[in-house]
């Protein structure tokens, strides 16, 4: 019987589902990177830049401290009177007879494969390698094009052009730059010589269709997403990127729009724009830039990369004199927001409509001017209002001058009437704007009417609403707020009215009798409204094309899946497809607006929804019915509203008269019928498209379409009214649809009965199986059990967490998506992983891009919901509005008794599977102050022992996480008392040990065998060197961090809690690396792609950027090649012995390690600053120079190039990432640079290790004598004392003390200089090497800033001192050493330090000697007050590696 019922269950489920489900349009949520709409008011790329002491050329940016207003400090020309860009006023531009047709040469040819595109960090530039020439248009000669640059705005077609025409700006501006090839060989040379250059400005305007000519450019943009990326472009025709007609253009003389702002540019600004679709436009908004801070890189979206417009001053703007080029109206070329020419509207609609009562008989209507004006100026506003009373319909219209306040007072208002208001802007020649939102007002309740929905926005009549009640639901076209007013109705009207240009008004909409009853009328009091009540514009060509694939119903529009906030989100006409195609990546964790920052603005957000419904709200005097109330059913069936005797059901019909299903998320018996009178306008519209397809009757339903538990759906008796589709025709008889309805209902009822029987039987079987398990679902069998069954998988199956009976239910039916499980077949053997990564890196990292796109798409078709996160009671608990917790995998807290227990189980956290372990991790956001108690409650309830934190509290001036632990002593968070026990600081991370105690659990209570269950230990591993939306500079420290935090987990503890700021990007990267390291150890295979796709189904956006995805592979490659090299001190002798034994090929592991130390990835050792011509003479040895990532920068001197460079590198120590600075012995002409470095970086210790004594006296001594100070402009250097310190072998260290005094203020810096003898000394015992190290370590404890170490070249001696210092500190603190990591990190940060295997072998010898000294009881050597060494080592000077081993 069971074998028979198992397949029946699936067949019946699919059959029933397919009969009631419908088409759904999905919208991707805003990602962490998608900062777009959240920061539109900010100019620039949202990068908050701190003033840096190091930079290359004069640094500038589009915002912040180096923004346009500060450009003049480094480029004086930026303050000139003839600057660009400008706003061009067409009416003041004169026609210049000298400006005739442009002559283009080569523009019609396809570009060669040498043309390439580069992300410069400020823009995206195309470097033209072919010959493109321009003449005419008043240019002084024949000019050659060299490069193309782009400027764009923030998001979604917002203004981004630099120039504007009549105040109108465009989404993108393309600029083509030219130079005179007869005079110069390059564009840059012409600029440096300050000679005339040319520039074309071409505007891009949004269009409903893709522009195929832009395809090579858009494809190229996807290859240069990150800063400094370059790619070759597919062939394109440059002429196709220009307007179709080149006759209409403006000419003026201006400047470059970026520093140096040279006023040498002859500008040609084309009047006609080039079309670009929203989908293509998204490629610009996905571009990243980087901000370098010290040697940590942060990644930001590059947006708003345009300069503010400048004054025209005494310049004249001219127009071309090409005949007939200026005849057309401007709207033929400057398209309306929907991208069609059919809509000749004056402006966008007036916004911010409000209706407020002044007294008992008067109302005030207010609005704001339109956001965009196509035909300025606005002359006046037309205010229309209509009302209905006792079936009499009236309407009045009056005008209001635009120069007065935008308010109107309506007198003699009756409290018993329903009023509808709308406003329209009127320009010259009686051109009018779109209508504003239609506001419905009755008594003290205001509602917005738009399309198929009515939303209330009024004020309370009984009691004030709570802040949660007034919180907006989502952004969109309507506002949904509540104020405690009893409100229970549904409007299912779809308006199709006239265009704004003045055609006759027709209305295809009716408010149901239920609506009127909800507004105070008796049932059925009004059957329809006059045809002039709700006129809206006829759909444009763009919307028609959208609706061709999705016909509009008279009863309801198609529903949409949840948008960023989980609400059903419809598309606006002309925008829907493009919005639906937004790339998930267009978002920044870093760029998002945090919830707490926007609390004040929440009331201005709007909700997108294609579902016609209204949430039933109650004031404090009306009790809310419970789910068990007889007034409604629990599972979304008929819902009876008090005051209505009966619910009626209507099935709408499609155009062909066949049965039409309700929208997704709505059962057919929940659709409200409305009367839609047939009109000629609709008939013409529907019949005008011969290719319009019929709507299929069956579509998959989106389980994401949900309603709150207070939503009620009311139906109206269809017998009273006719129903109509988009085409006018006689209404069908009542029996035509009642008989099929009865048949279908009967079949559905029979199927449901059978389905319930199957479910009961199925559940009974599962209960028998799971007997003995406390949870509803059985635990997934171990990998061994699955292997015995022949279905062994690489990872555990997806786990879903069923609602507890005590948890609040937001929706009646919570669906569980079917999630695929990664297979062992996808795993890559470790031996092939190196080759695999090489393939991914090939072809400009194309393999990584393809993989990550697959990751982004993997959850697109899964209807995974996050309704609890979107619930109004929980929204304030989310740090970011678009980072939500999936319902099926969310961590549920135990509800708190009493205090709002209904929603106290929510926290923005999800269980995430690990390698062969379900729920191995909890991925969560950085706690908000308001969620500290929930955070620690979750840690207690989940028995978490390890917290992994991968964010700093503040990054780039923005709050990323609140400090949820006490700085010292104890702090109480709800019932949990947290005590800080210890803090250990490392170079890249910090470890904190907490004791947590639950005050509600008593010591030794029953069931507590240990007697101390009320107190636990929690360890926090906090990584401090990982930038938001970016990746760490080096993989080795991350591997150490992951391994140590993973090893600290105890078997009896619960999941590891991992969080960053949003809990997705860096959190996901950590989880993947940790799990893959475990898989490598267990099976010697790797499956990054499969595992990431799997965990993406458990929390959204895990591993947020492609850069993070690449970093995972880099880190795993490092782990595979280097293996684990950390060794405890008691095993060091045997370990060294093992790596000295030759292998099969005759090579020892020591040799293999050293090869990895010296072979570094090219991207880590870029040294282009050191190789500049102006800096080459500052290097003693060209083979020992700083890598760009770790280069020490100087504060540049004003007006002098290259003054920021010095041959010096940061080196990571044990306690700080910049603990040391290794540099060369100063050259005579770099001595002042050396002291500037000390001054800039507050260094207080200098260790001088001369490799030989061959330096001349004047070169050897770079410090001043006692008699005379050294003047370094901003400060002076004075020698104040000189001492000597004797070592055990009678060698001496000469100690100089200097004072650096500022010339402008009282700041003083004390510096101690150690002039050391030859070190390490080959004639002395190896163990004596640590004498000098101990002296330096002890001195460093009392001083701040990095320790500067130098030998002649800044190479092996200095590197050896840093390495041994770090390793000795590691040995003291951890009783373990990692020679390989320390040596490789030094070579990564300063290439060329260790070049000989004997140098690497010496480090092992020294550490063996130090370990032997500790084992023999001789602790570290110290120095007494007089400088004498208290413990001297008398070891044999002939120590060798063999003897040490």
Swiss-Prot record:
Keyword Phosphoprotein: yes
Keywords: Disulfide bond, Glycoprotein, Hydrolase, Membrane, Phosphoprotein, Protein phosphatase, Repeat, Signal, Transmembrane, Transmembrane helix
Domain Fibronectin type-III: 349-448
Compositionally biased spans, kind Basic and acidic residues: 592-620, 689-711
Any one Gene Ontology BP term: signal transduction
Molecular function terms from GO: identical protein binding; protein tyrosine phosphatase activity; transmembrane receptor protein tyrosine phosphatase activity
Alpha-carbonic anhydrase domain sequence ranges: 58-321
Record: active site: 1060
Reactions listed under catalytic activity: O-phospho-L-tyrosyl-[protein] + H2O = L-tyrosyl-[protein] + phosphate
Highest taxon listed in the record's lineage: Eukaryota
Annotated tissue distribution: Found in a variety of tissues.
Transmembrane segments: 737-762
Positions bound to substrate: 1028, 1060-1066, 1104
Quaternary structure and interacting proteins, as annotated: Monomer; active form. Homodimer; inactive form. Interacts with CNTN3, CNTN4, CNTN5 and CNTN6.
The protein's role, per its UniProt record: Possesses tyrosine phosphatase activity.
Name of the protein described by the UniProt record: Receptor-type tyrosine-protein phosphatase gamma
């Amino acid at each position: 019987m069971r074998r028979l019922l198992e397949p029946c269950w699936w067949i019946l489920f699919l059959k029933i589902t397919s009969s009631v489900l419908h088409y759904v349009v999905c919208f991707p949520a805003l990602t962490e990177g998608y900062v777009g709409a959240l920061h539109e008011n900010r100019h620039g790329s949202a990068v908050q830049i701190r003033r840096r002491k190091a930079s290359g050329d004069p640094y500038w940016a589009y915002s912040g401290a180096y923004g346009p207003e500060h450009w003049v400090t480094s480029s004086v020309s930026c303050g000139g009177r003839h600057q660009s860009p400008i706003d061009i006023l067409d009416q003041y531009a004169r026609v210049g007879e000298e400006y005739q047709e442009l002559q283009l040469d080569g523009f019609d040819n396809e570009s060669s494969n040498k043309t390439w595109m580069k992300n410069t960090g400020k823009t995206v530039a195309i470097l033209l390698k072919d010959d493109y020439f321009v003449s005419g248009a008043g240019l002084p000669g024949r000019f050659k094009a060299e490069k193309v640059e782009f400027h764009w705005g923030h998001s979604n077609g917002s203004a981004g052009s630099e120039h504007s025409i009549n105040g109108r700006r465009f989404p993108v501006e393309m600029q083509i730059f030219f130079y005179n090839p007869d005079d110069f060989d390059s564009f840059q040379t012409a600029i440096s010589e300050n000679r005339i250059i040319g520039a074309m400005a071409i505007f891009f305007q949004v269009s409903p269709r893709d522009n195929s000519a832009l395809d090579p450019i858009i494809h190229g943009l996807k290859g240069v997403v990150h800063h400094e990326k370059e790619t070759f472009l597919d062939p394109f025709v440059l002429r196709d990127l220009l307007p179709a007609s080149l006759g209409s253009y403006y000419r003026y003389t201006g400047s470059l729009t970026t520093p140096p702002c040279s006023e040498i540019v002859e500008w040609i600004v084309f009047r006609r724009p080039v079309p670009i679709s929203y989908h293509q436009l998204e490629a610009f908004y996905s571009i990243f830039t980087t901000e370098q801070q010290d040697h940590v890189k942060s990644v930001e979206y590059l947006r708003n990369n345009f300069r503010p417009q400048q004054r025209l001053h005494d310049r004249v703007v001219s127009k071309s004199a090409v005949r007939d080029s200026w005849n057309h109206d401007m709207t033929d070329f400057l398209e309306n927001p929907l991208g069609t020419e059919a809509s000749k509207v004056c402006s966008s609609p007036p916004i911010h409509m409000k209706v407020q009562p002044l007294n008992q008989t008067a109302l005030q209507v207010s609005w704001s001017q339109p956001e965009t004006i196509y035909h300025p100026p606005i002359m006046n506003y037309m205010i229309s209002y209509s009302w209905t009373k006792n079936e009499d319909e009236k309407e009045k219209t009056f005008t209001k001058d635009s120069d007065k306040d935008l308010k109107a007072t309506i007198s003699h208002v009756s409290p018993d009437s329903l009023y509808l208001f709308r406003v329209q802007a009127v320009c010259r020649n009686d051109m009018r704007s779109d209508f504003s939102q239609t506001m419905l007002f009755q008594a003290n309740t205001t509602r917005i009417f738009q399309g198929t929905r009515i939303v209330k926005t009024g004020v309370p009549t009984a009691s004030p609403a709570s802040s949660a009640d007034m919180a907006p639901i989502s952004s969109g076209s309507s506002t949904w707020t509540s104020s405690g007013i009893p409100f229970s109705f549904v409007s299912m009207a779809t308006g199709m009215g006239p265009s704004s240009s003045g055609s006759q008004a027709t209305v295809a909409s009716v408010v149901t009798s239920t609506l009127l009853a909800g507004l105070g009328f008796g049932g059925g009091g009004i059957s329809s409204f006059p045809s002039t009540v709700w006129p809206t514009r006829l759909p444009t060509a763009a919307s028609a094309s959208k609706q061709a694939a999705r016909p509009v119903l008279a009863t309801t529009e198609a529903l949409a899946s949840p948008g960023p906030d989980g609400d059903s989100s419809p598309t606006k006409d002309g925008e829907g497809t493009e919005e639906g195609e937004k790339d998930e990546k267009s978002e920044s964790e870093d760029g998002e607006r945090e919830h707490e920052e926007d609390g004040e603005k929440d009331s201005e957000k709007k909700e997108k929804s294609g579902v016609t419904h209204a949430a039933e709200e109650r004031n404090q005097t009306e009790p809310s019915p419970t789910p068990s109330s007889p007034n409604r059913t629990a599972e979304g069936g008929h819902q009876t509203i008090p005051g209505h005797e009966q619910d009626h059901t209507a099935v709408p019909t499609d155009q062909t008269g066949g049965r039409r299903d309700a929208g997704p998320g709505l059962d057919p018996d929940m659709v409200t019928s409305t009367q839609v009178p047939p009109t000629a306008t609709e008939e013409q519209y529907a019949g005008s498209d011969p290719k319009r397809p019929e709507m299929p009757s069956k579509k998959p339903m989106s389980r994401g379409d949900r309603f709150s538990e207070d939503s009620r759906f009311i139906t109206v008796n269809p017998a009273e009214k006719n129903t109509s589709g988009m085409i006018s025709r006689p209404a069908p008889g009542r029996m035509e649809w009642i008989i099929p309805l009865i048949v279908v209902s009967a079949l559905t009822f029979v199927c449901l009965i059978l389905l319930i029987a199957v479910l009961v039987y199925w559940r009974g079987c599962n209960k028998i199986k799971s007997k003995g398990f406390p949870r509803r679902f059985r635990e997934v069998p171990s990998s061994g059990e699955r292997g015995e069954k022949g279905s062994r998988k690489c990872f555990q199956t997806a786990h879903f967490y069923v609602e507890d009976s005590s948890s609040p239910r937001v929706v009646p039916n919570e669906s569980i998506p079917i999630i695929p499980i990664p297979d062992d077949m996808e795993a890559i053997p470790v031996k092939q992983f190196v080759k695999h990564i090489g393939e991914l890196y090939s072809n400009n990292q194309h393999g990584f891009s393809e993989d990550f796109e697959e990751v982004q798409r993997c959850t697109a078709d899964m209807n995974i919901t996050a309704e609890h996160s979107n619930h109004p009671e929980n929204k304030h608990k989310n740090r970011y509005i678009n980072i939500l917790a999936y319902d099926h995998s969310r961590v549920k807290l135990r509800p708190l008794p009493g205090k709002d227990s209904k929603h106290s189980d929510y926290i923005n956290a999800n269980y995430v599977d690990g390698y062969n372990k379900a729920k191995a991790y909890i991925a969560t956001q950085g706690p908000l102050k308001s969620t500290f108690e929930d955070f620690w409650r979750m840690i207690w309830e989940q028995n978490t022992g390890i917290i992994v934190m991968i964010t700093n509290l503040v990054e780039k001036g923005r709050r990323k996480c609140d400090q949820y632990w006490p700085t010292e002593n104890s702090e109480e968070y709800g019932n949990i008392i947290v005590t800080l026990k210890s803090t250990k600081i490392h170079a890249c991370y910090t470890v904190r040990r907490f004791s947590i105690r639950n005050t509600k659990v008593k010591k030794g209570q029953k069931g507590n065998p240990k007697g101390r269950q009320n107190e636990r230990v929690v360890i926090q591993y906090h990584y401090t060197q990982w930038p938001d939306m970016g990746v760490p500079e080096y993989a080795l420290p991350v591997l150490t961090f992951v391994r140590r935090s993973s090893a600290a987990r105890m078997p009896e503890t619960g999941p590891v809690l991992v969080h960053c700021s949003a809990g997705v990007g860096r959190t996901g990267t950590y989880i993947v690396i940790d799990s893959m390291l475990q898989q490598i150890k267990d099976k010697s295979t790797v499956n990054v792609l499969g595992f990431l796709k799997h965990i993406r189904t458990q929390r959204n956006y895990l591993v947020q950027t492609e850069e993070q995805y690449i970093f995972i592979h880099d880190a795993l490659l490092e782990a595979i090649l280097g293996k684990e090299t950390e060794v405890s001190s008691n095993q060091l002798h045997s370990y060294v012995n093992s790596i000295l034994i030759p292998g099969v090929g005759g090579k020892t592991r020591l040799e293999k390690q050293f090869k990895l130390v010296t072979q570094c990835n090219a991207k880590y050792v870029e040294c282009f600053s050191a190789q500049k011509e102006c800096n080459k003479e500052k290097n003693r040895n060209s083979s020992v120079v700083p890598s760009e990532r770790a280069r020490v920068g100087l504060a540049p001197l004003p007006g002098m190039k290259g003054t920021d460079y010095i041959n010096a590198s940061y080196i990571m120590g044990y306690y700080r990432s910049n603990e040391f600075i290794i540099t060369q012995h100063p050259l005579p002409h770099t001595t002042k640079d050396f002291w500037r470095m000390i001054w800039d970086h507050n260094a207080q210790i200098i260790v001088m290790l001369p490799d030989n004594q061959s330096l001349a006296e004047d070169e050897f001594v770079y410090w001043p004598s006692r008699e005379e100070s050294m003047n370094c402009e901003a400060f002076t250097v004075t020698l104040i004392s000189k001492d000597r310190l004797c070592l055990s072998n009678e060698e001496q260290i000469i100690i100089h003390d200097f004072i650096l005094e500022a010339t402008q203020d009282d700041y003083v810096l004390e510096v101690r200089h150690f002039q050391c003898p030859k070190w390490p000394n080959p004639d002395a015992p190896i163990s004596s090497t640590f004498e000098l190290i101990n002296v330096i370590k002890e001195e460093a404890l009392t001083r701040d800033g990095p320790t500067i170490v130098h030998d002649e070249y800044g190479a092996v001696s200095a590197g050896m001192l840093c390495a041994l210092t770090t390793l000795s500190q590691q040995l003291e603190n951890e009783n373990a050493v990692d020679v390989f990591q320390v040596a490789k990190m030094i070579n990564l940060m300063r290439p060329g330090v260790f070049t000989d295997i004997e140098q690497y072998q010496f480090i092992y010898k020294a550490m063996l000697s130090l370990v032997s000294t500790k084992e023999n009881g001789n602790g570290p050597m110290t120095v007494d007050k007089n400088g004498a060494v208290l413990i001297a080592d008398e070891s044999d000077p002939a120590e060798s590696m063999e003897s040490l081993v």
